[in-house]
Structure formats: C-alpha cells, structure tokens
A protein has these predicted regions:
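Long, C-terminal catalytic modules of enzymes
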Residues: 284-390, 398, 404, 410
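Glycine-rich phosphate/diphosphate-binding loops that line cofactor/substrate pockets in enzymes
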Residues: 81, 102-117, 195-207
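Conserved short loop/turn motifs at secondary-structure junctions
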Residues: 92-96, 120-128, 160-162, 214-217
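Flexible glycine/proline-enriched surface loops and loop-helix/loop-strand junctions
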Residues: 16-17, 71-74, 85-89, 118-124, ...
C-alpha cells in the first residue's frame, strides 16, 4: 500500500510514509478538495459508485436548477463548484509541493475502491471549522468508491455491536435545557461544560447531581467556575461523586463513592478492530476468582479491594430505595423477572442479554454445553458471524418492509422510529437513534439497506 500522511510535524507516521504533506495548519481541507478536483477533472473518480449511492439528484436540483438533473451534468457541476481548488492554489495556500500533490492524486485515482483513510485530533480539533477536514476526507472516500470495501474505509458503527438491553423503559418526554440548551441545536454531545454558567445565570437548580467518573473542575474549561458552583448549595443541593480516583471535583462532593475500573465491574464493550464485529464482557476478577474457588458473593463490593462499588448493583439498590413500593414506576425497571418482588441480579440481567441479544452466541455456548453467560465469563468475548463489507448493499427482505411506505425518491419510510443498524430479521441489536427508522432504499428495482440518512444514501447535499 502507498502511505500518504498530512501532518505539519515530522511524526513517526510521516517518517514512514511514501508521501508527506507538511500542510500549513488549518489548510488541510483545501488540500483534500484540490485532490478531489483532480480526480474529477482527470476522470479517475468512481462515477458508477457516485451515481448509485450519492444523492446527486438533490444536489443538481437544489444548487444547479439551470442544469438538467441527469448524471452527465454532475462532473461539470462539481468542477465548477471546486474551480478555485487548483493544484497551484493548494501549493500556495497549504505550503506544499504542487508536483507531489498531482502525483498523490494520480496514485489515489489508480486505486479505486482501496482508499483507506483516518483523521484524528490534530487538524480536526486544532482549528476552528476543523470538522470540515473529516468531511473532505470522507469525500475522497466516496469519490473513489471506497466506502465499506475491502481495502477501503468503513463507518465505525459498522464494526461495533451494541446489544439491545433486556429491560429498557420508554424515553422520558421532558427536554433538559441544562444539558441540551436550545442555543446549540446541532451539538453532537450534551453541553455539560456550560452547566455551571447556566446555574449562575439562574436557569435552574440541581437538587441532586451525580458526577460519574467525571472531574469537571480539572477537565472542563474554567474550572474555577465549577469550583464556585460545586460549593454553592443554592445551585446544587447534593453532589455525589462516583469515581475510581480521588480528584479535585470529589473534594467538593457531599458523597464520594469509589467506583470500579474495568476489572472491578460488569460491562460490555465493542470496538472497531477488524472487518467484523465482536462483543467483550468485563467482569470483576476478584469476585470471579472467589466464586471459582467455591465462595458465594452476594454483592461485588464484598470481593473488590477497598469495598469498591459495582455501579450497576449500586443503581439497582438505589432505585429500590427511591421507589420502595413501586408507585413511581422506577422499581419495576430493576425487578427480577425470575423472582418477582426481588431486585434484579446482574447474573439474571446478563443471562437475558447474552441469550437474546447476541446472534450466534447461544448456539456457540450450547455446542460447548454451557450457558451464554458462562461462555462469556470463560472466554471474555464473542465474534459475531459474518463480515461488514458494503453493509449498504445488503438486500432487505420483505418482512422488514412491512409497515413502511415507498416515497417518490425510492425510500421506504417508517416514520417515528429509531433507525436500526441492520436487518431487523438478522439481529436484535442496533446502533441507537441513527436514521429515522426507514428500512430500505430502492436501487435498480431492489430494496437495499443503504445509509442512516434521510435519503438512505450518502448525502453530498442535505435538504
């Protein structure tokens, strides 16, 4: 493979790369668009993929109403759109070698379907508008038809697996303006860094505030404002710090509860490591060791060094104390199904999870003569069957289209539901809240899975 590195530093990666661009910080997006323009100009882009999986019709209709909405007009329209992003301009603005830029563009164009890319914090987080770097890099992935291909670039969610929890209440209907303020409607994460400022502005009052493995006084901007608010009982009534370490914020908490690290608690994990999916099971090793030696452990903190809490057990116990008679509708979410009237145990919880939400695991465990929970306890992880190549090209069976209506653009719509990540028939797992629940898009007369966007395609132009 040819390695291309864009980094103002002579990093370890840059030192091993075939081509290194030491672009002026903040100009990386310009450089990438210059490469994109060369691909289109020279005809070395994957026009077939672009026509099939990009919403180019919307792009032409909305931005170029003077042109007929036919694919033959897409290339010329893109060249006009990116007219200023010439190799000469990129060399001047980015401080790079023009000939090397042309060479790199040719190299990328010669490897359609095999463009693997990655961006991290430097250019994206270090500059205002740095998020455009990731978007422009993804444009190269699309122009080369390298989305989800062997040797290409996967969406990270395709290689993670999140099982559906066995018990899950309906989402609450109240919007939290303290965490999701209306001033930032497009924020990807909650605006927790602004919480003390909202409290000082009189927007609200926190009766009870949990900080879970979170040290805002040290981590967030303007730590002294956090210190001020954490000490002010008129702003926060009770502060509970759930933390594995003593820290600056815990100093100002009413209660400090030691929380376990990965080897002291139960949890599931999944990361994008290869062209497949897997799920891992974290468990308290001291408790597991004692149980293997014949001991009975009722609560994990009895086995953990320093009586460290197992936080899922903590919240189950806390919920039962908050709602002892079940009148608030809280206790029922943490009540045993096998033994009604008693709290849910983690053995029961994870048994339900592994038996019903991880495809292939029950069969694998049965072949060994053990339960799915015992399988995960012994082996620690499970690799799900199948690969994740070109997820969007998967056929969608008719059963998944039930209740959906095909619109004028070929999208099978099922409004009002969270988007599933894959075939509903195949799995009881999903990447939550992606898409709008539309199960498929029609491509050449066939229902395909597509992408979790309103058009079910890669959106060059979003309405």
């Amino acid at each position: 493979a040819t390695v291309i590195c864009i980094d103002p530093r002579l990093s370890n990666t840059a030192s091993k790369a075939d081509h290194w661009f030491s672009a002026w910080p903040g100009t990386e997006a310009f450089l990438l668009l210059a490469i994109a323009r060369l691909l289109i100009r020279d005809g070395t882009w994957d026009a077939t993929f672009f026509e099939r999986w990009v919403n180019w019709e919307t792009f032409l209709t909305e931005s170029r109403p003077d042109l007929d909405p036919v694919f033959a007009n897409v290339g010329p329209a893109l060249l006009e759109l990116y007219a200023e992003y010439t190799p000469e301009a990129a060399a001047r603005i980015c401080g790079i070698d023009e000939d090397r830029l042309r060479t790199v563009a040719r190299t990328i164009g010669e490897g359609l379907g095999g463009f693997a890319s990655h961006t991290w914090r430097a250019s994206s987080a270090g500059n205002e508008g740095g998020w455009m770097v990731a978007r422009c890099l993804q444009l190269l992935t699309v122009l080369t038809g390298s989305v989800g291909t062997v040797g290409g670039t996967n969406a990270n969610g395709w290689n993670k697996f999140i099982p559906v929890t066995p018990l899950h209440p309906e989402p609450q209907g109240r919007w939290n303006e303290m965490q999701w303020p209306s001033e930032y409607p497009l924020s990807h994460h909650e605006m927790s860094i602004l919480l003390p400022h909202f409290l000082k502005a009189g927007r609200g009052y926190l009766d009870t505030y949990f900080t879970r493995v979170y040290n805002p006084l040290w981590t967030n901007p303007d730590g002294f404002t956090w210190m001020e608010v954490l000490r002010d009982t008129d702003k926060i009534g009770c502060h509970v710090a759930l933390t594995p370490t003593w820290n600056e914020s815990a100093w100002f908490a009413d209660y400090v509860l030691p929380m376990g690290i990965a080897s002291e608690r139960h949890d599931v994990a999944s990361f994008e490591t290869h062209n497949g999916r897997w799920i891992g099971f974290r468990q308290p090793v001291a408790r597991r060791h004692r149980e293997l030696n014949g001991e009975t452990v009722e609560r994990t903190h009895e086995a953990n060094p320093g009586e460290v809490w197992e936080e899922q057990e903590f919240f189950i116990d806390l919920s039962w104390r908050i709602d002892p008679d079940g009148s608030l509708g809280i206790r029922s979410q943490f009540e045993s199904i096998q033994d009604p009237g008693k709290p849910l145990t983690l053995d029961e919880y994870y048994s339900m999870l592994f038996e019903n939400s991880v495809p292939g695991l029950p069969e694998e465990a049965e072949a060994l003569g053990i339960t799915p929970l015992e399988y995960m306890r012994r082996k620690g992880s499970f690799s799900l069957p199948g690969d994740q190549t070109q997820v969007y090209e998967r056929d969608v069976p008719a059963v998944d289209l039930e209740g959906a209506v095909r619109d004028a653009k070929g999208v099978w719509r099922r409004p009002g539901t969270a988007g599933s990540h894959e075939s509903l028939e195949e799995i009881r797992g999903h990447m939550p809240f992606i898409g709008d629940g539309s199960p498929a898009v029609e491509i050449d007369g066939e229902a395909r899975f597509g992408f979790p966007t309103p058009s079910k395609k890669l959106e060059f132009y979003s309405e």
